[in-house]
From Swiss-Prot:
Compartments in which it is found: Plastid, Chloroplast
HAMAP family, A to Z: MatK (MF_01390)
The name this protein goes by in its record: Maturase K
Transmembrane portions of the chain: none
GO CC field: chloroplast
GO biological process, one term: mRNA processing
Sequence similarity: Belongs to the intron maturase 2 family. MatK subfamily.
Role this protein plays: Usually encoded in the trnK tRNA gene intron. Probably assists in splicing its own and other chloroplast group II introns.
GO MF: RNA binding
Family matches, as InterPro entries: Domain_X, Maturase_MatK, Maturase_MatK_N
Provenance organism: Nepenthes alata (Winged pitcher plant)
Chief place where the protein resides: plastid
Top-level taxon in the UniProt lineage: Eukaryota
Record's keyword terms, sorted: Chloroplast, mRNA processing, Plastid, RNA-binding, tRNA processing
Amino acid sequence: MEELRGYLELDRSWQRDFLYTLILQEYIYSLAHDHGFNRTIFLENAGYEKKYSFLIVKRLITRMYQQNHLILSANDSNQNEFLGQKKNLYSQMISEGFAFIVEIPFSLQLLFSLEGKEIXXXXXXRSIHSIFPFLEDKFSHLNYVLDILIPHPVHLEILVQTIRYWTKDASSLHLLRFFLYEYRNWNSRISIKQYISFFSNRNQRLFLFLYNSHVCEYESIFIFLRNQPFHLRSTFSGAFLERILFYEKMEHLVKVFTKNFQVILWFFKDTFIHYVRYQGKSFVASKGTSLLMIKWKYYLVNFWQCYFSVWSQPRRIYINQLSNHSLDFMXFLSSVRLNPSVVRIQMFEKSFIIDNAINTFDTLVPNIHMSGSFAKEKFCNIFGHPISKPVWADLSDSDIIDRFGRICRSLSHYYSGSSRKKSLYRIKYILRLSCARTLARKHKSTVRTFLKRLGSEFLEEFFMEEEKVLSLILPRDSYTSQRFYRGRIWYLDIFCIHDLANHE
């Protein structure tokens, strides 16, 4: 009982009223926007960067010390001076600063506690490529997988309640509601796609944080329930009192499962279950039977609806057999393939031939999706035939070659872990020929003329970077094997998916 209570209990020291006061500190805005450091991909906003200065920050803090500029009325929001077009910069600055501040208690909890004891947490590499070695190691031994689209829309108030689990700072929560009021109607709903489109240039850090904290909240409880199948069988719901209304929801879940399955949660016992998530998509893979996966499916549906008040339809969760279906995940088509092999065994004067089959985890480049992305960006037509890029025709020859080369190297870098390199060579072919057509269009010549003029140097522009990296992995004297190396290489320095590879 105490063990379960300790898992869900929040440390009171992290619930002090300290977040709101930080919004009045000048250094917060410098840290929030990486002023003087390399900016992150979530904070790229050229227009805002030009307007940033400590003088503007001082004026902003002065205004906040004065009369209530943060009061927002639903009836006169258009007349509010603080939200006017001239004052919109202040609102954006506060929201970016607040996004940085609200991350502080979450970051500190992952590093250490006030008593100096380290919090046990699984260490994971930052690279998104680190997921694939895990899949190769685990999924090849499993049978079924739940292909899950994380439910949305999410009501704004649910996002605020998620933060309430971690901090009791009422002032900060009111400020959070202020920003949610500002950008959307309170009765509206936010979806994952709307996050990307609506907040692509403004306050992306804040709303990504809200969504990720919401997902992290249900993941923490989901993983806890998965790891405690036998404890939950006889545990009184009061053990979950520390989470707001969680104990009531647990009682409801117990009744639901008792009614439908005549058991509680112990039928989820499975030591070979694994969970992986990226953005709005997740997978639950198991070595069990299809019946077990059906139980997990309807458990998740009830879990989201009863605890998070999020409507989730069963059709958003697909049960697939790994040997018969491919997973569309992080711009790869992944599947488990049976790889037959013949082994000859010699024992004294007799020899035996044994047919052996090993499951291997394949990762393929999705040709159809890639052709669609290339056609959308005008590198090829809808049939996959390379075409010129007219919008780049006004650039210098070196800039054109450099742009195509960087895209080619970036995609080659990302898809280096593909099981079959043929699709990767197709990508290079499209970019190389599109580059040649763009140069020919600029100089009003033919493609053949430019290919003859550029020759091998043009090829090196697209392959040199890959060979340079492979030279660090393969022996120095195996130049041929470096150039035509067909093995899988997962680079652990990739933090985001290239736009052309991201089809989700």
